[in-house]
Amino acid sequence: MGLKINRPRRGSMGVYPRKRAADIVPRVRTWPEVNLGKPTLLGFAAYKAGMLHAVVVDDRPTSPLYGKEVVKAVTVLDAPPLYVAAVRLYTLDPTNGYKVAVGEAWVSEPPADLRRVLTLPEKFDTEKQLKALEEYRDVAVDVRVLVATQPRLSGIGKKTPEVLEIPVGGVPSIDERINFAISLLGKTVSPKDVFTPGQLVDVIAVTKGKGYQGVVKRFGVTILPRWHKHRKGHRRTGTIGPQAPALMFTQPRPGQMGFHQRTEYNKRILKIGDNGAEITPKSGFPHYGVIKGPYILLQGSVPGARKRLVVLRYPVRPPKKAPPAAEPQVVWVSSQSI
């Protein structure tokens, strides 16, 4: 028997095509069904400010360090309140089973900054639109709100808001969801209204862009020895595939790297604060600025560059052994940004 040669393929076909994301604002395709006993939004949006390290009391009962202080790397998200601009109802299309929007109601006078991104009339007849929504209350299967970020309240220094759609969940009753969504119309929602410290969330963002890269950096291809038999190149693959078929998608090839939408599951919220001065370094976060209002401390890293919009979502696949639901005890947060 000859020597068995086995090597895992380079890269993953699960993330093809490796091209730039269509929009820097993440598009969430899946939302979980949660039962909290009260209606709530299933997600929130915040801006990535930077990373710090914090001293936290380990609250995992099975950990050898249970009850002791440990150092954790944390990501700081600038989370100004979201403005609820509209309510939208969905029903099922009888021909294909897809969800289709059947009506929406906008706040009578949208914020001026919202006109930077959307073409809106001077005023909406909110009462008329709400009456029209009542006709679809019996056939509605999903309730969502259109929210706008408020970057003027962040440390970015931009004015144009991002607009995204967030479902209402927490209870199985559609009537309760509709009433809750209508009650939010024209109001703001803070991170404390959606999440609690200690819970797990999914993080969705567009990663840092790296531009056009070769196979070594893009796929981790082995660099060939620099001798005469490899005179045609060293930072390249030995072959790009057979003559037929002419194109092999499984073969590592150079191309776009980064600026892809990615989802990371089950990040734990360590703290939700109201005063960003508590955790902002003396000189501000590098390449970001000063956090003026609410913030979120997440354990671990988050995809994307500073100033990038990050969408937080209730977890779609929470672990069987979830960490304690109680609020973690954060002893100290560094004032030195990573």
Swiss-Prot record:
Tell me the superkingdom of the source.
Answer: Archaea
One Pfam entry name: Ribosomal_L3
Identify the keywords attached in UniProt to this record, alphabetized.
Ribonucleoprotein, Ribosomal protein, RNA-binding, rRNA-binding
Q: Carries keyword Ribosomal protein?
A: yes
GO MF terms held by the record: rRNA binding; structural constituent of ribosome
What function does the entry list? One of the primary rRNA binding proteins, it binds directly near the 3'-end of the 23S rRNA, where it nucleates assembly of the 50S subunit.
The record describes its quaternary structure and partners as: Part of the 50S ribosomal subunit. Forms a cluster with proteins L14 and L24e.
Q: What family, per the record?
A: Belongs to the universal ribosomal protein uL3 family.
Q: What is this protein called?
A: Large ribosomal subunit protein uL3
Higher taxonomy: Archaea, Thermoproteota, Thermoprotei, Thermoproteales, Thermoproteaceae
